[in-house]
Design a protein with these regions (language model features):
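Alpha-helical "hinge/linker" immediately C-terminal to small N-terminal DNA-binding modules
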Residues: 6-37
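Short beta-strand-centered segments that line the small-molecule binding cleft or hinge
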Residues: 16, 58-62, 80-123, 205-210
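Flexible hinge/capping segments at coil-to-helix
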Residues: 36-37, 108-145, 229-232
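Secondary-structure junction motif
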Residues: 55, 135, 141-167
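Short beta-strand-to-loop elements that line the ligand-binding cleft
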Residues: 70-79, 168-181
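A ligand-binding cleft/hinge motif common to bilobed small-molecule-binding domains
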Residues: 96-106, 158, 179-208
Length: 246
């Protein structure tokens, strides 16, 4: 030692024991950290691009905190085509999406959510309504319906056209690669779009909304037997976070 003191045999044993204990404590600490990481509950969720679900995520975080539960949530936005591809290939743990996209897929579990109110988006510069008071769907019968390009699935297009055909409207259509291009052309009064209240377009200052007499079924979906406990927790929390909105 620095003082020149020499440990007695029993002192040496105590010293060696202390060094060994310090080493073992460090090893146990690392082992505990590794185990904690392995046990961490986490989910990676896909959502359709253009959907604004921030307020719901914040409500979920409050629910988790007040209940003392832990669930790490990360989110990515995709086109419908990429969303389904990521889901099938297990690149995401689950998704929030229109139920119509999930029903045709095999080996998928899902939890129904409260349906979303559909809206018709049109430019604030659009000509006044025919009745001089308020718009109806009939006011747009001669306008173009602006749609997302149908790559892997025609379900969203069929859903929108089916609604209009039930109203006796068979519109000319134009397809786009992404939702931002649709919203831009709608704001320029080049047509109208059918969307829902989670769409960014519903809050765009250049657009107006006409509430439709239709609601879209939606769900949280995930591959069967894949991250089941975490996904079920997420699905239940997400549904609960929607309840005050209904």
């Amino acid at each position: 030692s620095r003082t020149g003191a020499v440990l007695s045999p029993i002192g040496k044993k105590y010293y060696d024991l202390f060094v060994e204990m310090e080493k073992r404590l460090a090893e146990l600490s690392m082992e505990a950290k590794r185990e904690s990481l392995q046990l961490e509950k986490s989910v990676h969720i896909g959502v359709p691009e253009g959907w604004d679900v921030l307020s719901l995520i914040e409500k979920m975080e409050v629910l988790l905190s007040t209940r003392g539960e832990e669930l790490k949530m990360t989110f990515s936005a995709y086109s419908y085509r990429l969303l389904l591809s990521q889901l099938r290939n297990h690149q995401i743990d689950g998704c929030i999406c229109p139920k119509g996209l999930i029903v045709p897929l095999e080996h998928m579990a899902f939890l129904d959510l409260p349906p979303l109110q559909n809206v018709l988006l049109y430019s604030r510069k659009h000509c006044p309504p025919e009745n001089g008071q308020e718009y109806t769907v009939k006011d747009f019968r001669k306008e173009k319906l602006l749609l997302l390009e149908q790559e892997d699935t025609s379900i969203p297009k069929a859903y929108q056209l089916g609604f209009l055909q039930d109203k006796g409207i068979i519109p000319e259509t134009k397809e786009y690669h992404n939702i931002d291009s649709i919203l831009l052309d709608v704001s320029l009064d080049k047509g109208f779009a059918i969307s829902d209240i989670w769409s960014r377009g519903a809050f765009d200052r250049n657009l107006s909304c006409l509430k439709l007499d239709q609601k879209m079924p939606i769900c949280v979906a995930w591959p069967e037997n894949h991250s089941f406990d975490e996904m079920r927790l997420f699905a239940d929390l997400f549904k609960e976070s929607m309840e005050p909105l209904q």
